[in-house]
Amino acid sequence: MKNKVFFLLHGLFLCFLFLIPFQGIEAQRKRKNIKVETKEVSLDAFKFRNVGPAFLSGRIADIVTHPDNDNVWYVAVGSGGVWKTENAGTTWSPIFDDQSTYSTGCITLDPSNPSTVWVGSGENVGGRHVAYGDGIFKSTDDGKSWKNMGLKNSEHISEIIVHPTNSDVVWVAAQGPLWSKGGERGLFKTLNGGITWKQVLGNKEWTGVTDIMLDPRDPNVIYAATWDRHRTVAALMGGGPGTAIYRSDNGGDSWNILSVGLPNNPDSNNDGIVNNDDSPIINMGKIGLAISPQQPDVIYAAIELERTQGGVYRSSNRGESWTKMSNTVSGGTGPHYYQELYASPHEFDRLYLMNVRVLTSGDGGKTFNQLPERDKHSDNHAIVFKDDDPNYIMLGTDAGIYESFDNAKTWRYIKNLPLTQFYKVAVNNAEPFYHIFGGTQDNGSAGGPSATDEREGIANKHWYKTLFADGHQSATDPVYNNIVYAETQQGGLHRIDLTTGEQVSIQPQASF
């Protein structure tokens, strides 16, 4: 009897095992026939919150002050929109956050109606970290609201000038795309306040306009500098046969090239290697222009040549002929990143050349000295003067805004303008609140908590610098939360111990 029961149970068990695969197959068939309901979740469900830091500022592209109230400033930021202050930097408001681009290259106010603000989006420098823009923007209510006025394919806009007495006439210098040919390049003009645009200079696929200026005596006289520019991942082609200086005497309807005394650009009907007289072609790079407010027949040009060489040139006859004054040229990462030239409104032949450190000349460009910059960040891009104060200078740098009231002897730093451009971020596994780390453009690397248990939340005091120079990518140790890795430019790699503050270079070295 026991054996019968045993064999019966054993047989039932084998049947059960035999049926299991078929049950699985049947279950799979049923699952295939079931329609799974899916829901689309909008990204609007995820709300961003500001975690800082606010103790670092960032790269300034352009600054303009209100002509009737010099406490009102508008600031175009390379990677942070447009900001406005009405109390000389005590407090700030971001006024461009709802627009289609965060990169801005230039800003100007209508001289006839300063409530009208024009912004050119897309910063006009040649670095790999530069974002492209979305054309021209216009505000008629002091920056409260904006309207896109076209030129969306320009990507990088270098200058906007509004006619001094006719608000409908505006000129826009568009450098054009950095990484590709074509787009909207050259000098564009509108006669109807930006409703329509006409290209009046430049028609080459690589040639844009990098600087323009008007004769203060006659707005029909316009000077423009064109620039051949193209970047790849590996290299920057920062010059070419299309680079030149032009003048128009009829508001941009026709142009004359101004080349007498300048480096020898190609003339017509040549083979691209030598000119017709067998002299070698010397291609020019980025050009910065300035006009003397005291004697507007005097024009200055800072010209980049091949292999980061160059010079400053001066004309006393509206550009008909030029004299080389010196070999001075912007340095650092190259003139493509600087090269803006300014003439002082207070002193004839006083020039300021934007550079790693500002270079200034009091003799029309013959000699240059470094502007005193004690306790001030380097890498300068924009300058502002006051008509009624010869000792006042405001500078826009890679680390924000500085102003001097004593002709650069001392500097006031505008600390409360949070504009830092982060390349990449990383997080550690710290508890109860993980920390965030990132490398920034020219403001080192930094870290800070994702939250705190303090009533005030995250404040500047909770953030800290981890490394110096140009940061890029940070990384964290998955086990030891106080170990962080950070980078500097040109391949520098460091290990940082947050407990001791020790920084050790661990950049791999070549073996010989």
Residue map of PLM features:
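Bacterial N-terminal signal peptides that target proteins for export
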Residues: M1-L12
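Boundary at the C-terminal end of the N-terminal hydrophobic targeting segment
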Residues: P21, E26-A27
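Bacterial N-terminal signal peptides
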Residues: H10-P21
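Beta-propeller blade termini and top-face loops
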Residues: A27-F512
